Amino acid sequence: MKKLSLLVLTALAMVACQKKEQVVDDSLFQNVGNPLFRNAFTADPATLVVGDRLYVYTGHDECFEDSIGYEGQYGFNITNWLLYSTEDMQTWKSHGQIFAPTDFAWASGEAWAAQCVEKNGKYYYFLTAQGKDEYNGKCVGVAVSDSPEGPFVDAIGKPLISDEMTDNGPRGWWNDIDPTVLEDEDGTPWLCWGNGTCFMAPLKDNMTELADTISVIPLPKYVEGPWLSRRGNNYYLIYVSMGEGRETISYAMSKSMKGPWEPMGEIAGMAENSFTIHPAICEFKGHWYFFYHNGNLELNGYKGAGGRRSVCVEEMFFNEDGTIKFVEQTEKGISNL
C-alpha cells in the first residue's frame, strides 16, 4: 500500500510539474491588461508586422525554485522561444514554442533576446544563445524560415557573432547578446547588439554575413537590449539604460543608420518587480506600440520575479519634432475590457 501511495504521489507530482510549465499551443485569449501574456512567463519581446497580423516573439522564463535550472546563469533559466500573434491587439493567439537554442548544433542553451525580420520573402530570426566550449560564451545566431511562424532552421551552422569578433569590454564573455536588425532606406540591413557596449555592423543581402567592420556606438548609460526602428526620416536606437538601481529605457536618434546618433534621454522607467526591462516598438494599423516586460504575473502558484517575467504593452506617442513621449507603465495597457 505504501508503494502504491508513493507511485500515486509521484504521478501527481509529475502531472503538477508538467502543468506549471505547460504552454498551450494554438489557443485564443483576450487582452485583459498587463501583463499581456498569462499562460507562461515571458520576457524580451520582439515584434514583427506581416500584413494584417502582428507577431510577438518572446523568451520563455522557467526559473522555478524547485526545478532543474533554478541555479542557472545569474538566476535566469530561459529555455526556448515562444510566439504570439494578433490582428486587433485584443484577441491573441498563442502559437507555443517555435524552437530552442539546443536546436542549433553550436549552442548549449539559454534562449536570450531575439528578433525576427523579413527579407526577400524569407524570415530571419536573429537570436542570442550560449555557445558551446569552442565559442567561449554568448553568441548571436541566425535561423531562417519561409514563414514567420516557422519552422526555423539554423541558417549557417555556426554563430554569426561570437566572442572573438568583439572587444570584451566590461561584460566579458556575455557582451554579444540582444540582436536587433533594421533595413536602411537603401535596402542595407543593419545589425546592432551588445551588453556593456553597443555594437553595429551592416549585413550582406543574404542576411547571414557581415558586410563591413563592426563599429561601436557610444551611448550614455547603455546596458543592453538595443532595438532599431524608423519613422519618417528619423531612425531610432532604443536601448536599456541604467536607472536608479535598476534598468530603464532610453533612446537616440539619427537621420542615417551610419550616424551620428544623438542621445535623447529616457522614455520609460524601471519595470515593476524586475531588475531587467527590454524594449520593442512597432507601428501596427496606424498606432505605435511599446512592448516591455515586468515581474508582476503570478502563475500556477509562482509569483513573478527577476527570472519569471511577463510581457506588457502600452501605446506610445511622438512629439511633432519626432521625439518620443515618455511611456507610462500601466496595469490596463491597451485592453478594451
Predicted regions and their residues:
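Bacterial Sec-dependent N-terminal signal peptides
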Residues: 1-27
